[in-house]
Amino acid sequence: MTLQSQSSHCLNVHSSMVRDIEKCEQKTKRDIEKKNTKSGGVRLNSRRLIHGRVAEKGTKSLPSLTQVTFEGEELKLKSGSHYFKSLDDAIDFFDYMVRSRPFYTAVDCNKVIGVFVRMNRPDVAISLYRKMEIRRIPLNIYSFNILIKCFCDCHKLSFSLSTFGKLTKLGFQPDVVTFNTLLHGLCLEDRISEALALFGYMVETGFLEAVALFDQMVEIGLTPVVITFNTLINGLCLEGRVLEAAALVNKMVGKGLHIDVVTYGTIVNGMCKMGDTKSALNLLSKMEETHIKPDVVIYSAIIDRLCKDGHHSDAQYLFSEMLEKGIAPNVFTYNCMIDGFCSFGRWSDAQRLLRDMIEREINPDVLTFNALISASVKEGKLFEAEKLCDEMLHRCIFPDTVTYNSMIYGFCKHNRFDDAKHMFDLMASPDVVTFNTIIDVYCRAKRVDEGMQLLREISRRGLVANTTTYNTLIHGFCEVDNLNAAQDLFQEMISHGVCPDTITCNILLYGFCENEKLEEALELFEVIQMSKIDLDTVAYNIIIHGMCKGSKVDEAWDLFCSLPIHGVEPDVQTYNVMISGFCGKSAISDANVLFHKMKDNGHEPDNSTYNTLIRGCLKAGEIDKSIELISEMRSNGFSGDAFTIKMVADLITDGRLDKSFSDMLS
C-alpha cells in the first residue's frame, strides 16, 4: 500500500469513527432533551455540558458535572504537573491541549480523559475523544481501549465492536485490555455464548497470560480479567450451564489463573439451584484444599438447598461447622434454616433458631416471621401466630402481603371469619391470593354471591383473577346446584384469557355428573379431549362413574379399556367405579375378573373395593363367594361398611341369610 493510499485509508477510518461518535452523541442529546422536557424543561447552564450523556440501559441517567463529587486530582503531563480542582477545570485544560497540538499527544489526552472515566462519566470521555478526532490528534491503543470501555459502560456494544474493528484496520494490535473490555461488555448485554467464544480465543492465543497489564487496566478503570471471568461464569450459571462453568474454572486454574471466592460462590450457587448438593459440597472441600476460605454466602447457599431437600441434619452440621470456623451466619442463613424446618413441620426447631439468632443480635426480618407465622397456621397454632405478629410490630417490622395472607388463612381455618375480614380490610394492597382466601370462605359457607362481589372487586382494584379464583367460584356454584352460573363463569374465565386447568374441568364434570346431567358432561369431556388440557385419572374416574350411574356400563368399560391409549394409568378408584358399575348391572363375573386383574396389575383393593363386590355377590345370591371375600377383606385389615352391614341385616331379617353371617362382618 502506498503512503498516499495509507493516508487515505486512515482518513476514511478516522471519518467513520467521528461519525460513530457523533451518532452516539446525537442519540444522547435526544435522550437528554426528552428527560429535560419530562422534568419541566430543566437546563444545564455550563457550556461544558454540551458533552452528551449516553443513556444507560436499565440504569438511571448520569449526573451532571456539577453534581459529581470531585475532590481534585493531580496529573503529570508533558508540560509538568497539573492540578485540577474540578472537572470543569479538566475540560478547560483538555480544550487547551487539543488547541496546542502537536505539543500534547494522545498520551497526555488519555491521562486527562482517564479522570472522567474514573469519575464514571463515560459520556464526557467519548465527547473528548471526538475533539481529538476533529483536531486530527492520533489515537493510540490506550485511547482505543478507553473508548471501547466507555461505549460498553454506556451499553452501546455496537459502537464498541465498531471501534474494535477500526483499531485493527488502523494496524493496532488488540491486547488483553481490549479483549477483556469487550468480554465484559458482552457479559453486560447477556451475550454469553459470544463472550464464551471470545474468552476461548483469548485462552488459545495466550492473552490471559499478560497479567502484567493489570495495573494499566486498573489505572483507566477497567476490571481485571478475574472479575470479568466471574461475570462470564455468572452468565453461564444463570443460563443453567453450571457444568460448563465448572469445567471452565478447572481449565483456568490449570492455566494459572487465580480463582477467588466469588467464582466458587457463583458455581456453588448454580449447583445448589440445580439440586446438585453433592457437587456443591465437593467444591466446598476443594476450596479448603486450595486455601480459599468459604464465606457466609457459600455456606448459606448449600444450607438453603439442604433444607429445601429435607436434609436438616446435614444443614445443622454445616451450620455448626460455620460457627466453629468463625464464619458468622447472617439473617439469610437463619432464614434458610427456619424456612426449611417450617416447611417440614419442625416448628419447635424453627422457634429455637429464632431465639438463637436474637441472642446473637442478628435481627430477624419480615421473611423470618413470615416463615414462622405460616408454619404456625399450618400446625393449627393460631395463638402462636398472633403472638409472632405482635412480636413483629414490637420490633417495628411491618407485616407484608404474605403475613396478612397467612393470618387471614389461619382465621378462616378456625372459623374466625370476622377477624379474617377485619384483617383483609386493614390491608392497603391485598393481592389475588388474599381475595382467593376470602372467596373460598364465602363459597364454603355457600355464600357464593358474596364471593362473586369480591371477584368484581378484584377487577376494580386493577388486579387479575387467576385460575384458582375461578375454580373456587365455579365449585361454589356447583355445590349450590347452580350449574348455569358455573357454566357462565367458565365462559367468562375463557373470554378474560384465564386458562382453565385440569381442576376446572374436573369440577364441572363432577358437577354435571352429580346433578344427573350426563350428556352435558360427555359433551364437555369431548371438548376438553380436543383441547390442550391434559385430563388426569380423576377426570376419567368422574366420567366412568357418571356413565355407570347413567346405565351406560358398556360405554364406561370401553372408556376404561382406552385409558392406556390416552396415557392414563387407572388407579384404585378407577377399578372401584368400574367394579361398582358391573355389580349394578348384575355382571358379577365381569366384576370378579376385573377384581383379579386389578390385583395382577399391582393395585391393592381397599375397603370400598371389598364392600362393593361383597354387596354385588350377596345381591346375586353368590353367598359362598361373598364369604370368601369377607375372609380376605378381614385378613387385609378392612371391615364391612354401613351399607354392607345394613344389607346383611335386611337379608337376615328376610330369612335369606343365617344370623352367623353378621358375626363374620364384625
Swiss-Prot record:
Pfam families reported for this sequence: PPR_1, PPR_2
Keyword line: Repeat
Family statement: Belongs to the PPR family. P subfamily.
Segments annotated as PPR repeats: 105-139, 140-174, 175-209, 225-259, 260-294, 295-329, 330-364, 365-399, 400-430, 431-465, 466-500, 501-535, 536-570, 571-605, 606-640
InterPro entries assigned: Pentatricopeptide_rpt (IPR002885), TPR-like_helical_dom_sf (IPR011990)
Protein known as: Pentatricopeptide repeat-containing protein At1g64100
Keyword Nuclease belongs to the record: no
Top-level taxon of origin: Eukaryota
Gene3D superfamilies reported in the protein's UniProt record: Tetratricopeptide repeat domain
